[in-house]
Amino acid sequence: DYIVSAIGNHNVNLWLNNYIKSNNIVSAVFYIWNEALDIGCHVALVKSDREYDYNNLFNRDKNGEMYDISSYVKKGQDVSKSYGGCTGTFIPYGASISLNSSMLFLNLLKKHVEGRISENVLCSEKGDDFYFNKAGFQKSMIYEMQKDKISMRPLSKIREGFNAT
């Protein structure tokens, strides 16, 4: 059995992760999300019977604010857009990045099915930063430090080098 969460909402995904853990649901969960303005996408593979989970992708800053340590967006920037109040708030990204995140997921699923992944991992794909830069946003050190287009890191090592902003 597999659970796929492609809604891109970290709060819902954290709730889902905690629900799965607290109810001892042993299933592979794929969390899929896109970064703003096509600068990248991510897929986390988490099995509740393995060490480390979706919570490991988050940390708190000196003010106690939670943030995604794997984000390609430098911390402290608001990249969301709003149309018609808070019900119309969204993160802008193009259709092509959704195709990339779908392929990233399918490749990770294939490796998982073939037994080639033995621990919980985060797979990240760098996208084109043209529109992101044009909009005046700053990329995180994570984006800058990732040399390859696609990176796969065990969640056990996710905090190594990922706490930089």
Question: Where in this protein do the model-derived segments appear?
Answer:
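Short, Asp-centered acidic motifs that coordinate Mg2+ and/or phosphate
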Residues: 2
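Glycine-rich phosphate/adenylate-binding loop
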Residues: 6-165
